Amino acid sequence: MKKNYALITGATAGIGLEIARELARLGHNIILTARREDRLRDISAQLMQEFNIDCNYVSADLAEFSAPDKIFNFCSEENYLVDILVNNAGYSINKKFHETGEEEEEKFLRVLGISIIALTKKFIPEMLERKNGKIMMVSSLASFAPPASGWGALYGPVKTFVNRFGDAININYRSQGITSTNVCPGFTVTEFHSASGMQDAMDKVPAFMKQDSTTVAIGAVNAMMKGKTVWISGILNKFIAFICNVLPASIVIKMSSSLAGGRYE
């Protein structure tokens, strides 16, 4: 008999790890996926011991074309039913646009964009059969504004695409029992910034603008379980998103440029 599972990408650190912990705390069986197999193995054992749920993992690099197939085939072979899909994996390129190689950009777009499409496409058919499924798109506050000056040109626009893709899933499948939630964190304290070479910039962000990954993850999971279309973490971030939507684009661009000393996750 098949058992239901929640699949989380980018699950070995930061928001992804805390989402896995929160779902496990709520009693969901977990499938972890990320690149670091040693971390996956350790976290899987911890979750099973702490929360008395079933947890398994598959190591995959979403920058590789074959990764979504590898993940889906693993779930099929193990007879897992994925009724919760958390598209969380991501990173940023700490270079200006003209300094970034095309191969590097292609890998970036595959992790943050193409793999989300592929995984969602692969798991939706089984959700449709059961008329039940929840999908989380971990986007960013950066999706509401142009990228900050000096921080590249792809991260914010790709996250804007993620939002629109999540909206499209809702439009096409909500009436059939499948919901998609766009989760938009602001400055969140995780390994994201050090891994992307941005820790110095993150250190300059005022403390009142930062959130911890556990708080963000709990709010994100709660929003997904309620079937919300979009969830922005924190009152300040909600205000920033509102301002970005109502002010003229020229003003928003100037405001975004002033954030060169910081970075959205």
Where in the sequence are the language-model features?
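Conserved glycine-rich cofactor-binding loop
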Residues: 12-14
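Conserved glycine-rich Rossmann-like NAD(P)H-binding loop of the short-chain dehydrogenase/reductase
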Residues: 26-43
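Conserved NAD(P)H cofactor-binding loop of Rossmann-fold oxidoreductase domains
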Residues: 88-93
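Substrate-binding pocket helix/loop in short-chain dehydrogenase/reductase
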Residues: 96-98, 104-109
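Active-site helix of classical SDR
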Residues: 120, 158
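Residue(s) in the substrate-gating loop at a strand-loop-helix junction
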Residues: 140
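C-terminal helical subdomain
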Residues: 182, 203-239
